[in-house]
Curated annotation (Swiss-Prot):
Belongs to the universal ribosomal protein uS13 family. Keywords: Ribonucleoprotein, Ribosomal protein, RNA-binding, rRNA-binding, tRNA-binding. The gene is rpsM. One of its GO terms (cellular component) is cytosol. GO terms for molecular function: rRNA binding; structural constituent of ribosome; tRNA binding. GO terms for biological process: translation. Located at the top of the head of the 30S subunit, it contacts several helices of the 16S rRNA. In the 70S ribosome it contacts the 23S rRNA (bridge B1a) and protein L5 of the 50S subunit (bridge B1b), connecting the 2 subunits; these bridges are implicated in subunit movement. Contacts the tRNAs in the A and P-sites. The lineage of its organism: Bacteria, Pseudomonadati, Pseudomonadota, Gammaproteobacteria, Alteromonadales. This is Small ribosomal subunit protein uS13. PANTHER family: 30S RIBOSOMAL PROTEIN S13/40S RIBOSOMAL PROTEIN S18, SMALL RIBOSOMAL SUBUNIT PROTEIN US13M. Part of the 30S ribosomal subunit. Forms a loose heterodimer with protein S19. Forms two bridges to the 50S subunit in the 70S ribosome. Pfam families: Ribosomal_S13. Residues 94-118 are annotated as: Disordered. It comes from Colwellia psychrerythraea (strain 34H / ATCC BAA-681) (Vibrio psychroerythus).
Length: 118
């Protein structure tokens, strides 16, 4: 297995699909990375030599991925909560942020129903 950005990339998958296993790289960015490195999208990771894998590593390192991206996202959420803005308050209360209805829906965000104590 090739190791890129601290993640073991699956060998049996095509290059475009395999590098989407890295947090922060989706389908569009994966296609752009393959185009920039000159790797065909249908090439499997196991067929790549070490030089091509090094090219992939170098191209992926240009982006914020994995731990750095997770840290950045969590710090952005924490900043909103510290500011006390509307979105921060909604994060703090574990409610939807973008104007969705909460009277009857939003069970995923709110969690299981809490029984009313009499």
């Amino acid at each position: 297995m090739a190791r890129i950005a601290g993640i073991n990339i699956p060998d049996r998958k095509h290059a475009v699909i395999a590098i989407t296993a890295i947090y922060g790289i989706g389908a569009t960015r994966a296609k752009a990375i393959c185009a920039a490195t000159g790797i065909a999208e249908s090439t499997k990771i196991s067929e790549l030599d070490e030089a091509k894998i090094d090219l992939l590593r170098a191209e992926v390192d240009k982006f914020t991925v994995e731990g750095d991206l997770r840290r950045e996202v969590s710090m952005n959420i924490k900043r909103l909560m510290d500011l006390g803005c509307y979105r921060g308050i909604r994060h703090r209360r574990s409610l939807p942020l973008r104007g969705q209805r909460t009277k009857t829906n939003a069970r995923t965000r709110k969690g299981p129903r809490k029984p009313i104590k009499k």
